[in-house]
Amino acid sequence: VAAAHRPQLDSLRRVVLGYDGTYLPTVLPGRSLPSEKDAVFKVGHVLFENISDNEAKTLMRTCGIAENTQVSLQQIEEAMRLLRDKYLYMDVTYSVTQDQNHYDLTLRAFHKSKSKVGLGARFDTEDMASVIMGADLVLNTRVPSRLGVVGKLGEQYYVRANFSLEPHLYRTLGFSYEFRNSDMNINHRGRRVYNLSYHRHTVGVSFTHLRLRNFSGEIGIKGTGYDYGDVLSGVYEVDHLKNKFFYSAYTNLRYNSQDKGYYPMRGSKLYVECSYVSDKIADWSRPHAFGVMSASWETISRLSRRFALQPGVRGRVLWGRDIPLPFANAYGGSMAGKYVDQQLPFVGVSRLEPSKAALMVADVKLRYNLLKNHYVTGIFNVAAENDKLSNLPRGRYFYGFGFKYGFDTRFGPIEAMFSYSNNSEKLLFYLGVGFDF
């Protein structure tokens, strides 16, 4: 939950359910659609085909669609999203026909599925090869419920199970368990300083509210246990690293209006999370407890038919003394949360590097759409770190830049990038094939 990122979700959706954030509604041919400038139009009759009466009533009530009222294309897209995400219809279409001074709207759905299983693979120069397997089951219970299981095989492997109850639409009570194995090299200024290996067990309970379009909010509690194997090896010594269990309470808010998980052309993303962590369930005062706040934002602006500008900023701040190593800030790599949940990506740094208690990264990407699915991107990012948020302007600064080529395929992007930073002072090469997970 702490590192829920859109590309990862899109990967699992495509692997398990067969679609992702690039899905666009299918409009039947031979129909008269309102033009883009008439995005809000009057609907006379609303018809449903192969959709149950209860589902139709829920769609109309939730999306605000009614006969003889003004309806927007966004409302129709929201209804179709519900048919796919909530009711698991694999083939959803809509059509509108003009009748005098109004339109008749028809929603069609086919091939409703009770469960889905999937398999995916990925290769990159950071994690080598990895395979993901997943299943999503809709259970036949009085209260709508689901069971999801996802497993990853690779150098960093995990298995995750989620059980959710949805007594009301958009309001979900979830229970989760995850086992994760981590074996990673930790760098400092581009050089390996030690190796860290451990098993992590996480159990959690959460409540999610998804009522507003593009927004979701979540509150929850979770417990996380760390079991260290080969604790540390290398030139650095870290004291007081013991097997331990931590308790945390958190809340987060997400907003995502981007049209695609990879190579979006419009929209923004925002993520904010606050949490409080303690190593004793009966004592939430310092020095046993500490606070965490993390946030990220990015948007995209089309400069022309082929050029797009994508600025972003992300950061994480810790409040407390003697922060345990598993919760310390970290940066590096091409993907957020790849090795640890709190990892912030940074172009020009290939491996995970620990950071001080206050860390902020800003980046800007200039992307050129070379051909239909071919993209060339120039990236520049800069970071600042210090022991306290108030001292961040006087902290250590470092920068990095890179040039990336990407080819977007139905099986995931193929990307190659050269990068450099004054943190590592090395020319780096990265190659990735497949969706991030």
Regions found by a protein language model. Name each.
Residues 73-74, 85, 91-93, 98-262, ...:
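Gram-negative/organellar outer-membrane beta-barrel architecture
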Residues 6-123, 134, 148-167, 291-296, ...:
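Periplasmic polypeptide-binding modules associated with outer-membrane biogenesis and secretion
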Residues 193, 350-353, 387-393:
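Short, glycine/charged-rich beta-strand-loop motifs at protein surfaces that mediate ligand recognition
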Residues 83, 364, 405, 416:
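Hydrophobic, well-ordered secondary-structure elements that form the walls
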Residues 397-408:
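C-terminal structured domain segments
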Residues 250-254, 258-371, 378:
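C-terminal outer-membrane beta-barrel translocator/porin domains of Gram-negative envelope proteins
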Residues 365-399:
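C-terminal hydrophobic structural anchor segments
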